Design a protein with these regions (language model features):
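P-loop NTPase motor core
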Residues: 31, 106-157, 161, 311-396, ...
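Conserved nucleotide-binding/hydrolysis micro-motifs of P-loop NTPases
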Residues: 39, 65-70, 97-102, 138, ...
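Extended interfacial segments that mediate partner engagement and assembly in macromolecular machines
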Residues: 217-229, 234, 241-249, 257, ...
Length: 471
């Protein structure tokens, strides 16, 4: 028989926060919510209090030298979680400011005891020693400018430390949360993004792939997905392997978005729902083309990417939620350049690492991911991604322009497919009637990737001959 004490976890009801804590707040724990002014400390405390308080588990909110209760309530009631019916029934607000100004701490302690030990929330370090006997789950809210102040005596006494901060770079601001410690809980490490809206706080856990995080569809060993363009499937030796990530690179107007549309339409024909995060266009622009029919039919879900100062964690959260809702097998991110611009500047320095985590999680779910990237066509320099992210993709398809007989032509080639054979041809392609048509292979030319193919022998040999004649 085990004598181990089981710690009850109190569910806060804040989206993403309980997961961060490791399942909720430990009952009867003494916690500190710390951070800079305006970082969301009071809102976090109120949102938890309104979610957890009930007639059998009442809550007390003591104010000391901060905002007066009336002023604080005036602003907090703007949030949707604020429930007027709980005031004085399940929640009571007590102002201790006058007692503190008079310097009579004994009166403060006496008044706290008068309000009942079972629902006490404490606010100073000296009261921490009484927590166990009072059996109160307590949150102390304090303003601290530097994380180094966590070494103070209040933090030593605390069972849990929740640190909130605001990161500012230029005109961009991002809110971050860190569970510094939470005794008895397996909490998530690192800093995590959160947002405040009319509904209160929503936490977006830092994206780290774990096999157990999401269900993974089962595919056959050799199962492949059609791109919706038969000739491209042929160049891929039967289509793109299921669960792969594909990077489609090309200059502006080369047909990258058109290929994503073909990819999603093929999914609809095969009963494979899709999800698209379109950073190049607003939802209105996106839904004005062929994708509108896919969305209205329920075959494709659209992620709202128009919010400013996004984080990778927010985008991944929305993608995973939509994938699970749609039971999607195909995911499109159009494009990586637009994706980077949608991010807060604070996250752009780590864009490569963040993209790696995102792709790993999405493909780990068993979805097949198609990403597009703008190719700066310098012709003489072959660069598949301006971010150095080409290695993240399992397969790469390159689209380019070439000047041939005084005309700009489109060509396409399969650069790589990890662990699979593929065509090495460079083939003409065109867009006719809103459909991609892949034509014949370029034969009899050299220097194709330079953008200025030369009919016949090697361009380098011809140049050497011209130089020798010039002598």
């Amino acid at each position: 028989m085990s004598n181990r004490v089981e710690i009850r976890r109190l569910i806060t009801g804040i989206p993403g926060f309980d997961e961060l804590l490791g399942g909720g707040v430990p009952e009867f724990s003494f916690n500190v919510i710390a951070g800079t002014p305006g970082s969301g400390k009071t809102t976090l405390a109120h949102q938890m209090m309104f979610a957890m308080a009930n007639p059998s588990q009442r809550a007390l909110f003591f104010t000391v030298l901060g905002e007066p209760p009336l002023k604080m309530l005036r602003y907090q009631q703007q949030f949707s979680f604020f429930d007027f019916e709980k005031i004085d029934q399940s929640i009571r607000f007590v102002n201790l400011a006058s007692d503190m100004v008079d310097g009579d701490f004994d009166r403060v302690l006496a008044r706290s005891n008068d309000h009942g030990a079972d629902s006490l929330q404490h606010f100073v370090q000296q009261l921490g020693m009484h927590m166990t006997s009072w059996q109160a789950t307590t949150f102390l809210i304090g303003e601290y400018l530097q994380p180094e102040e966590e070494a103070g005596p209040v933090f030593t006494v605390a069972d849990g430390i929740i640190w909130l901060s605001q990161l500012v770079r230029g005109d961009s601001m991002v809110r971050k949360m860190q569970i510094v410690k939470m005794r008895g809980m397996s909490h998530k490490l690192g800093t995590h993004t959160f947002r405040m809206s009319g509904n209160g706080i929503e936490v977006f856990r830092r994206a780290v792939f774990q096999e157990s995080d999401v269900p993974r569809p089962q595919y056959g060993v050799h199962e492949r997905l059609s791109l919706g363009v038969p000739a491209l499937d042929e160049m891929l030796c039967g289509g793109l392997p299921a669960g792969y990530s594909l990077l489609v690179v090309g200059p502006s107007g080369s047909g990258k978005t058109m290929l994503t549309t073909e990819f999603l339409e093929e999914g609809q024909r095969r009963g494979e729902p899709g999800v698209i995060a379109a950073f190049e266009k607003s939802p209105n622009q996106l839904l004005s083309n062929r994708l509108n029919a896919l969305v209205e039919s329920g075959a494709v879900g659209v992620i709202n990417t128009r919010t400013l100062d996004l984080s990778i964690d927010e985008i991944l959260h929305d993608l995973v939620a939509m994938i699970e809702k749609m039971k999607a097998k195909r995911v499109v991110i159009d494009s990586l350049s637009g994706f980077e611009l949608a991010l807060s500047s604070i996250f752009r320095d780590n864009f490569r690492e963040a993209l790696y985590r995102l792709v790993a999680i999405l493909t780990g779910m068993g979805t097949t991911v198609l990403m597009t990237a703008e190719l700066e066509d310098r012709y003489t320099v072959l660069q598949f991604s301006s971010y150095g992210n080409a290695f993240l993709a399992d397969a790469i398809i390159m689209q380019r322009y070439v000047e041939l007989d005084g005309q700009m032509k489109r060509v396409v080639s399969v650069v790589k497919v990890r662990g699979s054979d593929h065509s090495k041809d460079v083939r003409f392609f065109d867009i006719e009637g809103g459909t991609i048509t892949v034509g014949r292979r370029l034969s009899g030319y050299s220097g194709i990737l330079s953008g200025q193919p030369v009919r016949g022998g090697h361009a380098s040999v011809r140049r050497r001959k011209k130089l020798s004649l010039g002598r």
